[in-house]
Amino acid sequence: MRIICAMTAVACAAAMAGDVVLFDAATADVNSVRAQDGASFELKDGLLTVKTAPSDAYPGVCVSGKWDLSGCGRVEVEFVNGGIYGRYTLRLLNAGGVPAGKGSKIFKLPIRGEKHAVIGADFPPDLPELDAIVPQLKPVRVWAIPYLVWAPFPKPGESLDRRAPVGGVGTLDRSAVRQVAVYINKPLLPHTWSVRRIVAKAGDGAASARPVPAWAKMKPDQFFPFIDAYGQFKHREWPDKVHADADLARQRAKEEADLAAHPGPKGWDKWGGWADGPQLPKTGGFSTTKWNGKWWIVDPDGHLWWSHGPVRVTPSCATTPLDDHDHWFARLPAKGDPEAEFYSTRDKLLFPYYARWKKYRIYDFSAQNIARKYGTGWYETWSALAHRRLRSWGCNTIANSSDRDICLMDRTPYTDRYEIHSRPIAGHKGGWWDFCDPFDPSFRAEARQKTVEYRRQFEDPWCFGFFVDNEHHWGQADTLALSTLKSPADQPCKRVFRDRLKAKYGEIAKLNAQWKTSYTGWDEFLSVTTTPDPKAAKEDLEAFTVEIAEEYYRIIREELKRAAPGKLYLGCRWAGGAPLFTVKAAAKYCDVLSYNIYRRHLREFKLPDGIDKPILVGEFHFGALDRGPFCPGLILLKDQEERGRTYVDYVRSALEHPQFVGVHWHQFSDQATSGRFDGENMQVGWTDVCDTPYWETVRALREIGYDLYPTRAAGK
């Protein structure tokens, strides 16, 4: 990461004896602060106000100086007007601005929806053994490991998410700190936020007083292997952890009794719609309507329907790559072992991602454990159980990225997702995949081919709609047009852009005058891959970015509706938010707008002014570290009880919101403790890697799910 820092002559006077003030906006000189990675700032009225644009980097601010923090055990940042962004990063560095690792310490600072908050982070005790182990766990998500070691227990009524973590990455010589930076990690939207003070607090910090577990002091030869025969973290215990196949049998019997006692909500039709609610016209498929001021989906029987269910209903959630780290695992089956089949079971939707990451040796711990639990015919048994579980738990949806054969059992409505991989805009980078050129004929051809590949789902009345693509990197209002200009002369969208400009300006000289460029002709416009001054070309860049977005959505809709007029086009699942131009374009062509919204609730969410469309949450989750994997996902909570309470509140906030027509949890089962293709190893399932339900979550699902429709109808 590139760090550009301000120079300060000396550190400010400490606020309390022993405290070290690293930054105070009330006394700082405006010339002492510089931005990093495209951010801008204003130092005024005792606040350092920072503006950050969408970026693939780490925009923020940084201060340099000379500080001895050896007598300090905690660092606190005073935020004002924290904005909508949920997590900032505080980074302390020794000399040289080295990357993550030696010479730096990174703290994740959670703040969401706060007008004013002081967020602090404890320095952990020095553990050289753990520092030696953590780098060997890459690419597994390791930022939360300090929570397991020094878990900062909250006060009564205080969420762990609202307390600061201990430093998660890197080592630091506290006696020679030279730089302090506050920034956002690759923001997708513009943000404005302010910092008043950054203070290192005297004392040891609360983390130093907490007992350190034995495994955190192990040497590597003691720590490895750290994954047991069931795919669980070997060195910790928690309720319902599996130690033998007999534990699986006991859990199966326990759940069977629970399902028999809870067959599902009353007053639902076969689709999970509101049979006791109003009768609307039957269309034979799923549609949308606004009833009593709120958006709804309508099921094929003409009943109001609100989508509630999990993403990735598959027996292969805990598939993990083995490349170069067989020593992580206490047991992997030998060739010829009956369980060697689980080297080849796979999550079909995510397998292309493993290939893209060049992860070809994999093992499926989740399917292995399910086979041990249910025996011969395990796949068929588990598939039928998945439908039974969902209805019992108050759900009516199998959300996208789930097992196709389970969806096609026609017992639970489902949505699917496909991705278009045609010729990309060569100058575009970022996101899961490069953005495809909608003006290239291959785009429509690929969109049409997908409807052929998914023909069974398109013809299935239980499939209510499709997401197309996922979490595109849209950038700013001019990004797609700038990406077009960076592309070669034969890029179709670049030729279309040339034609639009030629029609508008006629002569290249007029374009040059407006853009402050020096093209010799329209042919050179095509061949040049440098970009103009964005301010001079702003109007044209933004207009063509809109045209690309509209062409993208238009073609997808046309091909989807050509194949199946009765299926809903559910958009592309924006990551948290989306720039205005793509929301407006999607509103023209999508039946439902979709966002992946990782927040604690949705009460503050709103569409841009002038847009009134139904919204579907494609992903959300919360995790805790009292069970299973050592990563809690994107929102960390204290424990499973708090996760259950927060789940109820999130879904209730969506039910009370007039535009949400459903929420989809990510994901049905925990990810592998040893990580998937990109290292994700999150405790975010409704079941763990051994197929054991998290009973606190099940109770929460039923609490809100069984009253889904009365809650939606009443609302606010």
Regions found by a protein language model. Name each.
Residues A17-D37:
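Extracellular carbohydrate-recognition regions
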Residues S40-Y58:
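Short carbohydrate-recognition loop motifs
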Residues P461-G465, D469-E471, I635-W686:
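Substrate-binding cleft of secreted/luminal carbohydrate-active enzymes
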Residues P300, P310-V311, A318, H325-T376, ...:
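Polysaccharide-binding and catalytic clefts of secreted carbohydrate-active enzymes
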Residues T52-G167, L189-S194:
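Extracellular ligand-binding interfaces
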Residues S483-R495, H666-K716:
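Aromatic-rich peripheral "rim/lid" segments of glycoside hydrolase catalytic domains that contact
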Residues I362-I370, A426-C436, V528-E542, I611-Y650, ...:
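Active-site clefts of carbohydrate-active enzymes
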Residues A543-E558, R562-G633, V648-R652:
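Glycoside hydrolase catalytic-domain groove-lining segments
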